[in-house]
């Protein structure tokens, strides 16, 4: 939100209705699906956000193009309760653990505030097929979310957590977790994916 936009809208509001309205510097939303770029990671649990972004792009007729080498970015409009909502759909190319660089770059460039950002990511704490939406909160051990929290300077944005189930715990928990998120879905699970 810029001082100029507040002043401009304050003046317009006085002339029109005597109400104060503040319009965001950008009325766009940013929807970012997290994952790792490259064919090596296609179809892995950690790329659940990329898969969701691809489904949304197809549904909303969004075409991706490069944004500063940091993300594939597309623009669209969706009808939400009779209202047209403009949005950017992003797939960061920075690898999962540096997702914040791409999200912060897009956010800054298009002046999108954190409360207009939605991040879609895999979540091992949810069973496969479960989806939870939450606003803000902890990263829950997810390195992509930690990176976004750091880069935006706040955890106050929406997350769509997509369940991928949990790796076996035990003596080699870290290795099991890495292998799990970078592994593919089983045959029964693949049948349920779009």
Regions found by a protein language model. Name each.
Residues 139:
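Conserved TIR/SEFIR loop-to-helix hotspot centered on a Trp-containing motif
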Residues 4-23:
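Short, Lys/Arg-enriched N-terminal segments with co-localized hydrophobic residues
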Residues 173-176, 183-194:
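A charged, well-structured terminal subsegment
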Residues 20-136, 145-161, 166-178:
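Nucleotide and nucleotide-moiety/phosphate-recognizing core
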